[in-house]
From Swiss-Prot:
Species annotation: Wolbachia sp. subsp. Drosophila simulans (strain wRi)
Protein name as annotated: DNA repair protein RecO
Keyword DNA damage: yes
BP terms from Gene Ontology: DNA recombination; double-strand break repair
Cystine crosslinks: none
């Protein structure tokens, strides 16, 4: 069995002295793993977030298989000196590695992840909004879309200030004030991102509020369901 595709590196682990187990998020084949050979000059090629042209081959589809890779675009060197950006990229790559089903195409998420890498690489000031959008999209693509369009109790679309941790639905200030200590906040940044307003800039504290909300649902719907530990790097984004 053999196929060719483009893919983004989401994990790379040494296997012996001369091989690497590579995990790619590919455009048409989803998350795929395979062995690839290391050479003296190939380490730079296999950095998280780099874009590769990959040829995968194996006797059977369920085998680990082998990758032959050519570098299309190197990305990690653009932001590795920025601690927050590098942690964000590595963290999301780790999330994809842990929660994406094997061999199931997810072209919408792939295209958005590739676009996000370009956004963060070119120092777009709204990259944090694009990142929250990426986490919301991941939840949606895996079947856990949040409904933040209107109040779950009254149906109103104004003054949405809370999110129910049980349902992932928005709650208005009037309906939720009495239960505020049992609800998640609905930060303005996340409200704008949900409504596809991605060009605004916000404080880092506002970004962290958004991360707490999306992180809660990533953990609840994906990691706990898979019995997988939530990535420490993702938690680190809240303490920088």
């Amino acid at each position: 069995m053999r196929w060719k595709d483009e893919g983004i590196i989401i994990a790379a682990k040494k296997y012996g002295d001369k091989n690497l187990i590579l995990s790619l998020f590919t455009k048409n084949h989803g998350k795929r793993r395979g062995l690839t050979k290391l050479t003296n000059n190939s380490n730079y090629k296999f950095q998280i977030s780099n874009l590769l042209h990959a040829e995968w081959s194996a006797k059977l589809p369920e085998n680990l298989g082998f990758f032959k890779c050519e570098l299309i675009e190197s990305s990690f060197h653009h932001f590795f000196q920025d601690r927050l950006k590098s942690i964000t990229i590595v963290s999301f790559s780790s999330i994809l590695e842990k929660v994406l089903p094997e061999s199931e195409p997810c072209a919408v998420l792939y295209d958005n992840f590739r676009y996000f890498i370009d956004v963060i690489k070119h120092n777009n000031q709204s990259w944090q909004s694009h990142y929250l959008n990426l986490e919301l999209l991941l939840l949606t693509q895996l079947g856990f879309k949040l409904d933040l369009s209107k109040c779950a109790v009254t149906g109103v679309k104004e003054n949405l200030q809370f999110i129910s941790p049980k349902t992932g639905r928005a709650v208005s200030k009037k309906a939720g004030d009495y239960y505020a200590d049992k609800l998640l906040p609905f930060p303005q940044m996340l409200h704008d991102v949900y409504n596809n307003n991605l060009q605004n800039s916000y404080s880092f504290q506002e970004f962290q509020l958004g991360l707490k909300v999306t992180g809660y649902f990533l953990n609840k719907y994906l990691f706990l369901q898979l019995n997988v530990k939530f990535p420490e790097l993702r938690n680190l984004m809240l303490s920088l």
